[in-house]
Amino acid sequence: MAGVGAAALSLLLHLGALALAAGAEGGAVPREPPGQQTTAHSSVLAGNSQEQWHPLREWLGRLEAAVMELREQNKDLQTRVRQLESCECHPASPQCWGLGRAWPEGARWEPDACTACVCQDGAAHCGPQAHLPHCRGCSQNGQTYGNGETFSPDACTTCRCLTGAVQCQGPSCSELNCLESCTPPGECCPICRPGCDYEGQLYEEGVTFLSSSNPCLQCTCLRSRVRCMALKCPPSPCPEPVLRPGHCCPTCQGCTEGGSHWEHGQEWTTPGDPCRICRCLEGHIQCRQRECASLCPYPARPLPGTCCPVCDGCFLNGREHRSGEPVGSGDPCSHCRCANGSVQCEPLPCPPVPCRHPGKIPGQCCPVCDGCEYQGHQYQSQETFRLQERGLCVRCSCQAGEVSCEEQECPVTPCALPASGRQLCPACELDGEEFAEGVQWEPDGRPCTACVCQDGVPKCGAVLCPPAPCQHPTQPPGACCPSCDSCTYHSQVYANGQNFTDADSPCHACHCQDGTVTCSLVDCPPTTCARPQSGPGQCCPRCPDCILEEEVFVDGESFSHPRDPCQECRCQEGHAHCQPRPCPRAPCAHPLPGTCCPNDCSGCAFGGKEYPSGADFPHPSDPCRLCRCLSGNVQCLARRCVPLPCPEPVLLPGECCPQCPAAPAPAGCPRPGAAHARHQEYFSPPGDPCRRCLCLDGSVSCQRLPCPPAPCAHPRQGPCCPSCDGCLYQGKEFASGERFPSPTAACHLCLCWEGSVSCEPKACAPALCPFPARGDCCPDCDGCEYLGESYLSNQEFPDPREPCNLCTCLGGFVTCGRRPCEPPGCSHPLIPSGHCCPTCQGCRYHGVTTASGETLPDPLDPTCSLCTCQEGSMRCQKKPCPPALCPHPSPGPCFCPVCHSCLSQGREHQDGEEFEGPAGSCEWCRCQAGQVSCVRLQCPPLPCKLQVTERGSCCPRCRGCLAHGEEHPEGSRWVPPDSACSSCVCHEGVVTCARIQCISSCAQPRQGPHDCCPQCSDCEHEGRKYEPGESFQPGADPCEVCICEPQPEGPPSLRCHRRQCPSLVGCPPSQLLPPGPQHCCPTCAEALSNCSEGLLGSELAPPDPCYTCQCQDLTWLCIHQACPELSCPLSERHTPPGSCCPVCRAPTQSCVHQGREVASGERWTVDTCTSCSCMAGTVRCQSQRCSPLSCGPDKAPALSPGSCCPRCLPRPASCMAFGDPHYRTFDGRLLHFQGSCSYVLAKDCHSGDFSVHVTNDDRGRSGVAWTQEVAVLLGDMAVRLLQDGAVTVDGHPVALPFLQEPLLYVELRGHTVILHAQPGLQVLWDGQSQVEVSVPGSYQGRTCGLCGNFNGFAQDDLQGPEGLLLPSEAAFGNSWQVSEGLWPGRPCSAGREVDPCRAAGYRARREANARCGVLKSSPFSRCHAVVPPEPFFAACVYDLCACGPGSSADACLCDALEAYASHCRQAGVTPTWRGPTLCVVGCPLERGFVFDECGPPCPRTCFNQHIPLGELAAHCVRPCVPGCQCPAGLVEHEAHCIPPEACPQVLLTGDQPLGARPSPSREPQETP
């Protein structure tokens, strides 16, 4: 009670003090009924008065609670008093009260673990238990802390006092994944130092780089994290870019030379030749000579190391002159000096003279009156001269510098046109206008034509333009000669006075003045980068721009990163360098993170959470400490526990303050739209985060949060207080890092950074045009500013410096040209001073200006011509000439006729010169004093009878012979081009050609492969040696001649032949004269026949029957008939009358061929290519010659029935059945079918030419089969190929080889039976189980059966007899079953799908794989590329599993290997695969045969041993076959290998045969 009352008393005293304070301020204390709880809305007082009454209310609440507790205790006391009053009083021992109970005297208890109490004399004496270790306190930094107390020495460390020791721990920081870290000020945990570690490389913050592992990724280091984006390759400036290792985008190939490297498009000057400019174009260096602008007429030589001459001096006559220095001149009357590359000359001053036409005396500079100068000509005093003006003759005289003239009649001169009217001088008329003799003029409408009147005839031609007096003249439209009124420079026309930039050299500023262009270098400002660049059309190099996120920034510009405004970027050297903006230090210790920097003091970031300013929150690690956020600063204090009215408070687990047991919970406060606020809880009203409220026992008190001053110049308004996370500038908000145009200053750019705005002038990129217009901020090329004036694009304006020019602005470029003028109506208009366009009020002719009507000497020919200006057109005419006194005068000075030489037929001849007369006149002329006299020529006699006079010639010449389009002279001999062993001779216009008749002059002559006649090894005959080139007659016959011919190598040799006599065509027999002594050829007593145009193409028989003559090209061409060689002796030869060649007398001896006697003269055919005949007991055979074939890829050479030579037919195909049986179709598909019946293997399904059937046998095993026999049906004939090579034809056994013409031929080659059928069918049977059927390409698309349809597509080979595709190979094979076989009617089993390896087991499959592996080994390696081995390997494994162990497995293996080798041979590859123990083939060694894997299909026999191998192979179109062959050097004859010399005699005549055949009983012609 005492305690409670004391507490109540203290509350009352405190309440009174508050009331007095409130009363002093004039307020009243409101009273509320006890037990009534006010709501949050009613308890919120307005204004400052309510805030002042707030503490009073709190104390009133506490006082009311204490009074209520006193009331309850009072009731308990009254109850105890009544109990005590009923008890008897006994003396009691003193007691103590503690922990809610009474303790007897001397009792000891512990209110807590470190405090002990003892009851003495009714009082509790409590004290600390310092002797216990865990009850000792702690002291740190001068501060004392109790046991168990938690404190924080700084914001990042939490400590606790336990048993006298302080235990501290830092904050829980996450692990960092970086190389370097740092702890920012005010933070507890370290962060990664700005920068990125990527792929083992350290990059600074903000830098942009390419990934080292993938160059197509562009990465940026932002906030210690790497962000990568795929690069977009720009379009390549070259047509063939190259992708280099380590690069993403293809680049243009550069150039390397002499240790230097240049990029594509880069230009440079070679060190040794400054005038040589080279350029790199995709790895190739192209060089050209620099074109130097003509800046002055006499520039000084280039400075050392430079190319172009300079105008700071003059180089003249091989000497250098400085500017201003005198220069020597060829004119002594002028003084010249050098002026900046030009020579300026001034005439020497002359005194005045008293005459009007003073003349110049040679050697003097000034004119004097001792002579006259008139119309550009010099005359001596007292000299008389004549002129022609306006068609009249004028006589003038010179008298002391004065000229007087008078008209005079002209003498009559011969001219082409007679004079008319009163005009006495010869005149010309052209286009209705008359011109005097010698006048020159330009006809109207033809400005580039000049005419002159000569001998009364106008002669016009193109005007010869003089050299222009300027260096860059222009050819005006419609003008004849170039003009210096404008300049043509690098194919561009510029007006006079125009300034322009050279398109080829943009760093040259040029000026056009009077047709000459002068250029000077442009001064470029210095650049701030190491590698400046020059763009197209730019003069000066500039630093490259930067491209970042598809935005362009100029060099030196600072800007915000387009995607991250927290980064500041700067463009340098074409690369954007970015880094985080520096953050200002926050004015508080725990600011909130802003957009870029942690500087928002409107709240606190503490312990990983964010709190608004004014918020109270528990300490993140000590629940007994309470923290408060005040403008970014955090203050944490230990919770203060209020005194409790109960004697025994209870400390609940997890709580910081003890509580009275069963004490009623303080009343909470309602919150709109949320749960009730607890007692002593702070909260913000909904929608008003800037106010802070406190709930105390159901009452709510609120106040506005205070705002600290913002540490920035332009803060924006935050939720409650101004914030530096952004800017408020001129009424607009901007994000931190944002750039924006200044709203107050034009052309300025502002940056918002952490609440402050800074503005600076906008950076401008240099304009890409020479005359940019003034833009709003920067110059742009949308218009032009020219000489201080602004113009719009496409606007025309007058040139401010040249009133006659008109300029055009186009995209910042200004082009000025001459103002267009109307074309004048005259040929030589004049531009008066102050005017822009020409007029016809005067004339300007070749730099000379004259008034209308004025006459002056022609500037082009001042000696011989005068010109007059007539209304803007100059009319020029030649001065008159005196008449010539000779009939053939030549032109003299001024083209006047003189008699010093002769002019004949348009050519001038000197006096006394002799020359030919006119063409065809046959005259010889002579020039004498202007007169020409001619006499007729006399032709010399010719020694030939045939003479011809050509057109244009005077005299005839001897005519030779024309042969093969070439003329040969009379008596010449030559070898015709088409026959090297013939000789032709020309005699009296007749060409006679015959084969050279050879004779021998030695015992052993030799004949080379290219010699026509045999030669003797040396030039010696009958003991006499002859020199090279010497010829002689070897015997008494004058027609025989020998010649000693030199040889290219070795000594000379002797060649002898009979002379060739010319043909005496047309000579009558009565006029034939025999040859005289020592003469060889007869002659004709009269002239031979002439081959005229009427006889062209006709033939004539000469007296010699060995010649045939034909009239060709006006020449008789006589050819000697070739006689065949005779086999009979000379004694049995005779020449029939009227014949040329001898023949053998008919013999009676017969021939024996193949055991058959043949009569002499009888002929027979061996095969389609070879025919034989019997002559004089000898068999002669002749074979047809076949031309070589060139077939396409889908065709091959093949023989048709009845033909000798092959022709191009579709390529043949083959089908094979082998093993257990596997079928490879014509189209290449491999099938497996094990039926043991008879089946159609291949058949001609269109015309029924053939049908091949196979009969399979299971050999006593179930589910397997092998080919047992083959039946070939040819019409009515049936051929069966049985086991062990047996063959029957129509049921009868036959011996091989077997021939039944013309259909069938069967032979045995080795162990293989080969059947040839007339339609081109071929069947190969090994006598065991393998059969191969080959058909020519003509059967493409016509076959059916197990071999398929031969249409080139393997996918549709499973077609049954009805033409339908069947679903399985077993169904397909069964559909072609036929009812026949080895034993008709025997039982057979249909094919089904089986797998013999599954039944045989794993071991059998493994052994089969091992043995069949030879197909994939080296013996067959060359074939793998052309024939895949996998199908054959699978078939081989299948067969070995089916065959089982033993010798049958060896046969199955050889079948599969032989099948694969056969396909390899057809593909052109011959594998060598047989070995001593692998599939050995035996051949009859006793008959000389050996085995050959790829033997010739047409072996060497006695009948074809003389045929070249290449021709023999070309005739036998089948590829090589394995079998028994004769070794090299032996030939086959009657199944034996014998030497060629042991063959019987067989004579072959005619052309060389290509494919001679053996006897019919051995082998017929092979067909594919």
From Swiss-Prot:
Domain VWFC intervals: 136-193, 194-253, 253-312, 312-370, 426-485, 485-544, 544-602, 602-661, 667-725, 725-782, 782-841, 900-959, 959-1017, 1017-1085, 1082-1145, 1149-1209
Keyword presence, Disulfide bond: yes
Gene Ontology biological-process entries: positive regulation of BMP signaling pathway
Major subcellular location class: secreted
InterPro entries the UniProt entry points to: Kielin_Chordin-BMP_Reg, Ser_inhib-like_sf, VWF/SSPO/ZAN-like_Cys-rich_dom, VWF_dom, VWF_type-D
Keyword Coiled coil in record: yes
SMART domains according to UniProt: C8 (SM00832), VWC (SM00214), VWC_out (SM00215), VWD (SM00216)
Domain VWFD: 1213-1389
CDD domains: TIL
Bias (Polar residues) ranges: 35-49
Residue ranges of coiled coil: 60-87
Positions bearing carbohydrate: 340, 499, 1090
Subunit structure: Interacts with BMP7 and, by doing so, enhances binding to the type I receptors that contains cytoplasmic serine/threonine protein kinase domains. Also able to interact with activin-A and TGFB1.
Function: Enhances bone morphogenetic protein (BMP) signaling in a paracrine manner. In contrast, it inhibits both the activin-A and TGFB1-mediated signaling pathways.
The protein's name in its UniProt record: Kielin/chordin-like protein
Biological source species: Homo sapiens
Gene: KCP
